[in-house]
Every structure is written in structure tokens, then in C-alpha cells.
Amino acid sequence: MKKTALALLALLVSSASLAATPWQKITHPVPGSAQSIGGFSNGCIVGADTLPVQSEHYQVMRTDQRRYFGHPDLVMFIQRLSTQVSNLGFGTVLIGDMGMPAGGRFNGGHASHQTGLDVDIFLQLPKTRWTQAQLLRPQAIDLVSRDGKHVVPSLWKPEISSLIKLAAEDNDVTRIFVNPAIKQQLCLDAGTDRDWLRKVRPWFQHRAHMHVRLRCPADSLECEDQPLPPPGDGCGAELQSWFEPPEPGTTKPEKKTPPPLPPSCQALLDEHVL
């Protein structure tokens, strides 16, 4: 009985944590000129574009989740990158989550992806296009060793390094988040051409995909950009600190209460949902 009660409690907690946010009730982009509003982890978007799900250069995964919306700059970046990759003969780019029709907070899985300027891209480039069944239930390839200290040599391919480099060299890209072990391998692969590495930032998880973030568009006056990454290639002490064990007594930070929405985002919710 106790086990059953605990199981039911866990299910209720899980269900509550995955309850739909108000943003998920907005099923179509909000009309208007494209405006990314607020910060990447606390914002929204007006006038989002829909990424076409049919393309000869890329494929969109989990279309049933309807997370293929973003600022026109993001849509153009995806089209630009995937065309470059295709022209080089690397394979098909696999597109994961972008944002919801009006951006905003997800019910789980992402803290950012709220202003239409973020996209997840799988770090695999299949030569054969995936079936619809594969796209709906994609199988990620974990490129990082079990101990988290390096990539798996048999899984790492030069095309993956080139994919990340191509994305980082795009003028609209401000950051790319990957696992520290992947960043470490990129540092080893880069040779003397290293300027692009500054944009590639180590982050938790991200073992099978890269998270690409664009800068705020010039005409999105309420968009909040992050500071630029520190100068340099980021391959030194900062990167190595990710592989050091936590200091004794270190505890996980408590989950923070989400900050208030930017006024324009709250007004958008008030008009379209609440």
C-alpha cells in the first residue's frame, strides 16, 4: 500500500510539473512585425515565422510537439546552415526544438528557447533521410563517454566538428552550447583557426546536440542580449574546470521562482490567453 501511495504521489507530482503553461495555449504566431521580447529565459515573441517542415537540406524532428517557430532570423539561419552542410555533402541537418508560436516558458525540458532565437540541432548528419517514424521518435547518439571526460572516438566524426564550426562562424550566432567533452574535442581539432571557438560554450548535458543561440535582432528593441563570451578560445583553465570534481560540501542550487514576465509579454498573455 505504501509503495502504491508513493507511486501515485510521484505520478501526481510529475503530472503537475508537466502541466501546460499558458504559452502552450497559443497555437499560432501572434500577428505583427517580428519582435523578440525580453531575455532568452524570460521572454516571448510577436510575429514568429514557422520553419517549413519540408526541405531537401534539413528535417524537423518531433513535429507533433509544434516547437518549430522562431524569429525570421532564426528560420533564415537554419536554412543557410543546412544549405552549406548539404553543399559540402555532409548529410541532412536534424532540427530539434526551436520555440512555441509566441515563445514563452515551456512546461519542461528548456529554460530558454523563449524569444524565438534558440534552436537545438542534433550532432549527427545522416546520409539517408529519416522516415516519419524516426523523426517523431528520434534516437540521439550520445557522443560523450560514460565518465564525461572525452568523446567516444568511434562516434566522433570530422563532419560534426565542421557542422559546429559552420554554425559558430555565422554572423547572427552569439553562442553555441555543447557538452564540455565536445568542446574539448573541438579544441583539439581546431588547429590554428580558433576564433570561432569563442562562441562554443561548455554546458551541462548537451551530449548529442548543440544549442545554437542568435543575437538580438537590431529592430527588436525590447530584446535582452547576453554579454559577449570572454575573449579567447575558451580551451584553457575555464574548460578544464568542468572536469574537476565539485568541492566538498557543494550543494545543488535551489530552484528559483521564475521572475515576472516583461510587461509586453504579460500584455500578450492577457490579450490572447488569460
Swiss-Prot record:
Name the cystine pairs: C44-C265, C187-C235, C216-C223
Tell me the enzyme class: hydrolase
Q: Which UniProt keywords apply?
A: Disulfide bond, Hydrolase, Metal-binding, Metalloprotease, Periplasm, Protease, Signal, Zinc
- According to the record, the signal peptide region is 1-19
Region spans: Disordered: 225-274
Identify a single GO molecular function assigned to this protein. Answer: metal ion binding
Name-wise, this protein is Penicillin-insensitive murein endopeptidase
**What gene name is listed for this protein?**
mepA
